């Protein structure tokens, strides 16, 4: 099984996986409007030889079979302040001061 991966022209780090090149017939019209003009990113075999970066291989395969597409959204932004405040360390302000 292969999939064709397209990059969104409207949303950064958003990708659409479909089974066949330029076949968006099973993708909802509203999703395509929000996605913008698809730009071909790559064609990838789904046999497990190559690891997907931000998507689970089995979920992608299941979505392609069930609905004909898989939408990969960007990861949530890192909250560096929250990480800093929750990490133990010597450079934190003393609550007693």
UniProtKB/Swiss-Prot annotation:
Region of interest (Disordered), ranges: 74-97
One Pfam family it belongs to: YcgL
Residues annotated as domain YcgL: 1-85
Domain of life: Bacteria
InterPro entries given in the database record: YcgL-like_sf, YcgL_dom
HAMAP family linked to this entry: UPF0745
Name of the featured protein: YcgL domain-containing protein CKO_01183
């Amino acid at each position: 099984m292969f999939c064709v991966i397209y990059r969104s022209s409207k949303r950064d780090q958003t990708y659409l996986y479909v089974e066949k090149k330029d076949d968006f017939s099973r993708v909802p019209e509203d999703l395509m409007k929000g996605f913008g003009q698809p730009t071909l990113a790559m064609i990838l075999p789904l046999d497990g030889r190559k690891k997907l970066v931000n998507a689970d291989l089995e979920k992608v395969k299941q979505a392609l079979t069930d609905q004909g597409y898989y939408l990969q959204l960007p990861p949530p932004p890192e909250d560096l302040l929250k990480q800093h405040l929750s990490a133990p360390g010597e450079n934190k302000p003393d609550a007693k001061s």
